[in-house]
Amino acid sequence: MAVNDALLARLGQIKGTGAVDAVFQKLGQSEILNAMKRECVFTKFVKTRNIKNGKSFDFQVTGRATAAYVEPGVPLLGGLGGNSPGDNNVKNIAVDGLMAADQAIYDLDQLMNYADVASEYFEQLGIALAWEVDKRIARILFAGANSTTEPLARSVNTGRIGFKKTLTAGYTAASKQARGDELASAIGDVKVAMKKKDVPTSGLVCVVPPDEYDFLNEGTRVINTDFNGGQSNGTIASGAVGRVKGIPIYESNHLIQPAYTLSTYDKNPDYAQDLTKCRALIFSREAVGMLTLRAPKFQMTTADSTFNIQYQATLGVATQSIGIGRLRDECAACIVIP
């Protein structure tokens, strides 16, 4: 110890040894660093139906009629040009098992905690349900985009299947600008393919993951005023992308997903999809349907309930009962990497 060093009494030590702040009080405040909210994009763009006292819902699939010349002396009996009312089908959407998210908070822990976290914990239960619905819709859209089975038999009704566009082998190693330009071109190809199948394109939307959204913003064409009639279609400054070939662009963290394994309570095998290579989903509201038997509902035990008395804890449960399925596969398309 140097001659001029002061011998300090360290008030935070225990018996003069160890950590110098061991006996100091730990202070906290009521601010909670909660999980960031994640927007659910897909849920906003599907056809929804609320049902009661049922397990499924049927959507009728009908086709086109044809015109032909009348043969003199031949009666019109309903089959001119091969027309047949029997060329129809049905799309059935079944309600899956009851989905829930729950949390039990021990009363003593809540009393000791300096922050009221119960409300935040219970809010996350509803968010968990919303996320699961959004991810399931994305998987069903991907299934529809990859469909190759025609729903009807007559040749005049062909083309009612999905569309998949595969990017080039060099896409993943290319620059941001190059990837943005290639993706924009692929979105245009999808729109043309849908037009050829008579799909109305006015209601199409495109959802991409955050990386691809940034690539479109970095590209040389999407936000370039020379390609947009002198009008703004997003800027580097704002980081926003407006439209590509007239299709509004959205971003979602639920687009790229690992392979999903079906559960016992999944009624639709189309949930089992692998979206690891998916880089865009283009679709309209007609592509997917969602049934709601029980809307999202939150329940919490009361202070004098049997659960609270027995476990000295508060239980919060969020539940919903839904079913999601393909409707018009021709209204769904995906863009994937090789």
Tell where the protein language model's regions lie, with residue ranges.
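Alpha-helical scaffold segments that mediate packing/assembly in large oligomeric complexes
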Residues: L108-A193, V336-I337
